[in-house]
Amino acid sequence: MSELTALTIAEARDKLKAKAITATELTDAYLSAIDAANDAINAYVAVTHDQARSMAKASDERIAKGEAGALEGIPLGVKDLFATKGVHTQACSHILDGFKPEYESTVTANLWADGAVMLGKLNMDEFAMGSSNETSYYGPVKNPWRAKGSNADLVPGGSSGGSAAAVAAHLCAGATATDTGGSIRQPAAFTGTVGIKPTYGRVSRWGTVAFASSLDQAGPIARDVRDAAILMKSMASLDLKDTTSVDLPVPDYEAALGRSVKGMKIGIPREYRVDGMPGEIEELWQKGIQYLKDAGAEIVDISLPHTKYALPAYYIVAPAEASSNLARYDGVRYGLRVPGKDIADMYEQTRAAGFGKEVKRRIMIGTYVLSAGYYDAYYLRAQKVRTLIKKDFEDVFAKGVDAILTPATPSAAFGLADEVLANDPVKMYLNDIFTVTVNMAGLPGIAVPGGLNGQGLPLGLQLIGRPFEEETLFQAAHVIEQAAGRFTPAKWW
């Protein structure tokens, strides 16, 4: 069975097409793998055995009739942020206890329309707030990777930790994820997988539980660049139900793979050389530069002067939008309800019991920066900084730079229940230092494995592109992947 779960999406697609395997066999192999591993890894919060089998059966029937879709019979995991009709959708929060939506998100509807099979819902940081998948009501996810000679559990990154861990542990062929400040790219880097955050507006947000509406964007996490390109093609679409959705044709991203990067201009931002950056990250970055150089790309030094303000500005804008978005959870119509002596007390009791510590922290920060006395001092200034960050990128791209290469994270995966990080939220927030600028500017960014560190843990590189030029990112990421190789964790679970 494990040889079936070892297939990439591209390989499984070809075997299904050739009728060498059936969608039912493939789905059963994944369900068996999940049943055997999920107690150890905790990647899934709900497994849809019956639905998966009936979707696989329907796929086999369509394949037999010659009516196969682009993802026919491919078993996928869905981050618990996407509405799935009649299936557990709780953003891994206690406050949404028992919530099963009456509708399907646009992203998942697109995937099912192309023939994909749903294996279940994936664990994540509560309401997508976190960088380690430790804020989930359903407990932390364990990274399938471990340091050489160690049994210590590591975090998979966040907030899409369940998506990244499930892909790395071969508990799904690919997964949906979301990225508000790095929640696709950071977990991908921590697990040796590939994750792309598309341009803001490229993929519909409809039916995705909102965290920070002007920053949220859905994308795939997959085992390699080709699989990420295949998934992205199905996920992206114009959607009139999302006012930020852009009416641009969706290219065949897979076709960009294998194109030469000869003459492509790759920018290296000097501001990303942050104080205290570990030597292994600097080394990885140099390796990435060399890979692209060897393939014929032109490397240029660039400046993004407002980078140092990105993290503080992000941690004002995102909580402000979150405090507004999360005001709707009150226990009245759905989810958890804790009785109170009157309606105001019921709201208070429900929200106090329903939200976790990190979500409460961000709601409080957001409410504070939006309050009348502080709005100008914090929120307005953060939005001005955001405009300057966007302009930095526009200036660089105007000079002919095609893509920007940076590290994806400031370190490899760290330990589960790290006391220093648990007691200092700002240290935890620093995990997003290389990724937040991309969300602030609405640009596309991809994380691709660049190598392993001295402890045998994966390290990721990030490529940032011009708006709606994801093809360039797939093209350059594929070159890095070909040079660096692919990485799979040694099985301990």
Swiss-Prot record:
Gene Ontology BP term (one): translation
Reaction(s) this enzyme catalyzes, per UniProt: L-glutamyl-tRNA(Gln) + L-glutamine + ATP + H2O = L-glutaminyl-tRNA(Gln) + L-glutamate + ADP + phosphate + H(+)
Keyword check for Plastid: no
Catalytic residues (positions): 79 (charge relay system), 159 (charge relay system), 183 (acyl-ester intermediate)
Annotated GO CC locations: glutamyl-tRNA(Gln) amidotransferase complex
GO molecular function: ATP binding; glutaminyl-tRNA synthase (glutamine-hydrolyzing) activity
Keywords linked to the UniProt accession: ATP-binding, Ligase, Nucleotide-binding, Protein biosynthesis
EC number: 6.3.5.7
SUPFAM superfamilies documented for this protein: Amidase signature (AS) enzymes
InterPro entries: Amidase (IPR000120), Amidase_CS (IPR020556), Amidase_dom (IPR023631), AS_sf (IPR036928), GatA (IPR004412)
Coiled coil: none
UniProt keyword Protein biosynthesis present: yes
Recorded family membership: Belongs to the amidase family. GatA subfamily.
Function statement: Allows the formation of correctly charged Gln-tRNA(Gln) through the transamidation of misacylated Glu-tRNA(Gln) in organisms which lack glutaminyl-tRNA synthetase. The reaction takes place in the presence of glutamine and ATP through an activated gamma-phospho-Glu-tRNA(Gln).
Subunit structure: Heterotrimer of A, B and C subunits.
The protein, known as: Glutamyl-tRNA(Gln) amidotransferase subunit A
